[in-house]
Amino acid sequence: MNVLNEKSLTVRGKDRYKSGVMSYKKMGYWEPDYTPKDTDIICLFRVTPQDGVDPIEAAAAVAGESSTATWTVVWTDRLTAAEKYRAKCYRVDPVPGAEGQYFAYIAYDLDLFEPGSISNLTASVIGNVFGFKPLKALRLEDMRLPVAYVKTFKGPPTGIVVERERLDKFGRPLLGATVKPKLGLSGRNYGRVVYEALKGGLDFTKDDENINSQPFMHWRERFLYCMEAVNRAQAATGEIKGSYLNVTAATMEDMYERAEFAKELGSVVVMIDLVIGYTAIQSMSNWARKNDMILHLHRAGHSTYTRQRNHGVSFRVISKWMRLAGVDHIHAGTVVGKLEGDPLTTRGYYDICREEHNPMQLEHGIFFDQNWASLNKMMPVASGGIHAGQMHQLIQHLGEDVVLQFGGGTIGHPMGIQAGATANRVALEAMILARNEGRDYVSEGPDILAKAAASCTPLKQALEVWKDVTFNYQSTDAPDYVTTPAVA
């Protein structure tokens, strides 16, 4: 790994505080000899300097502008513990295969951050600095969050273990479906979709991100019909069922009102969108914890800043923030579906959601060891362009602690919604049985599905309708240090 080496140029003593403009390197934001403390928050930025800008100066500027610096020397620095509070860029590496881009490692003292506040954390590390003129682009790739900081957060209110206990469902992925079309259905027809899907074998149905309270269906009407459907499906199947009721609204007062009504109706889960903001997410997490509710997060809007390789915030960082903030479910990609998702990078997202400790794995895009202390695990959700014919691939790539959501793959079934749900449930049960028997379910997957379909007409129809459907596009966000193998 080629590391840019340049000794510290920090000006010390009275010359450091002379009025005027001084380079960020000289102000102390470049410290190549610094060894990060166990309690430091470390950020890895992908820095793309403007032409002619020294990459180390650009990296030092990121450290300065995301901590204590401004554009000129200020004498009030002498009233603070400036040496302590300055963020320190201690390493700059060229990004492999990306000319003009650099990885900058920056350490922040823990005292720079308010305990237990995602809003405060993000105001520093992705605040003003992303608009800094000397940079063409800037991306926050990863973070190391010290245990001392992690433990100031409450984390997911329910967690994977307790959720499975409440549902009494173990040893397999959970199955869901997003109601389609996402907009335009009446409350009565919406409830009918929920009932058919749950009766057919799904564990959950879900509101989509932009179904809130529109003229064609107000939120209270939707909640009533959905919960009637859930209760009827539970009575018909003898299984615990749920529907993610989206309580996203214009104000916190409205969201609390909707969540309380969902609880009164007996719902086990409520849903929010990422676009409500970090403070609102933490507030809803506190509500869910107090009311023993599962909290589902739709990552609506994330691609506006996670999609581009050289600018924005990586979804692995968003995943870390959401585990701190405290959500139980988070959409994390499918690998084989219609949405962006490099296989190795997606594996890294899932590891962040589900593991107690994440070791550094550059092949998964994870640059730091991360200890999650005692925080609950999040259940990742795979949604977007998946169908029963991909079941062996989904289990291979995503494991069993995941919600597999077949929206179009349920509701678009030629025999109807209930048949679509049954097709997915039978495909899943057949694949899990093969796995538990020790068979090579990945290579034998198509044969396993074909054999199950011989005695299940809905699955046979699903395999026929979607047999040629794939979404094989080049990912825009793949690991920098390895080449991702093709999806089988």
Swiss-Prot record:
InterPro entries hit by this protein: RuBisCO, RuBisCo_large_chain_AS, RuBisCO_lsu_C, RuBisCO_lsu_C_sf, RuBisCO_lsu_fd_N, RuBisCO_lsu_N_sf, RuBisCO_lsuI
Keyword check for Protein transport: no
Binding site for substrate: 128, 178, 182, 299, 331, 383
Site feature (Transition state stabilizer) residues: 338
Co-factor remark: Binds 1 Mg(2+) ion per subunit.
Lyase keyword on record: yes
A single MF term (Gene Ontology): magnesium ion binding
Disulfide bonds: none
Designated name of the protein: Ribulose bisphosphate carboxylase large chain 2
Source organism (scientific name): Nitrobacter hamburgensis (strain DSM 10229 / NCIMB 13809 / X14)
Gene from which the chain derives: cbbL2
